[in-house]
Amino acid sequence: EFKQAEDAIARAEQDRLFMLLMSGRKQVIKTGQINGVPFKVKIDSLLDGDICREIVKEFPKTADTFGFCDGAIVDEKYVRDINPVWKSRIGWVPFVEAWGYDLQGAIYQRIDDRYLPFLLAAITKESPARIAALTVEQPDLDAKIIEVEELAPYYQSIKEGKTEPTRCGVCEYCRQTEVLDDIINYKILGVEERDE
């Protein structure tokens, strides 16, 4: 896996646009509140206006993404692949939505408080690695921040131990706290709750 990661990094380093996206201020920590709930974010690459203009000059097709912005928030993702993900109750979903990166972008954007474009610099774990520069459109971020505003107090209540979480059966918390109370047929394992 170390060799695979090295190969993926080498692949990304060969691409000028990818490297420009990752050339901003690194690991910028910001704190703030959403609906009275504290949040802390760590931005992988915070681009300033000069870097954005340099990108648009070298890569004119990016002009629609950057517009006249004063910067951009870039999050680097090292992922299995960038293909749509099957969600049993929904169907095929873009990987960005399946793994909540759009929600993450909405939080980052709100905490940064400048509403800069939110971009993903994705590298896959495939061999050879695939790279992608992706944007999450503002209407999608706006919809997600409404979701965060509505749910933040509930999650804060869970975090403080005041509310018992609703179990989904598949998340990290559920796997860690699972208690067996039945024996099930292997053929139905995960049919209802599993999303892949």
Task: Describe the predicted segments one by one.
Residues 41-92, 108:
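Conserved catalytic cores of phosphodiester-cleaving nucleases, focusing on short active-site segments
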Residues 95-196:
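Metal-dependent nuclease catalytic regions and adjoining charged, substrate-binding loops involved
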Residues 1-43, 166-172:
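Metal-dependent nuclease catalytic cores that hydrolyze phosphodiester bonds in DNA/RNA
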Residues 30-34, 47-49, 122-124:
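Short acidic, glycine-rich loop/turn motifs
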Residues 31, 79-81, 125-127:
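Short, solvent-exposed loop/turn segments at secondary-structure junctions
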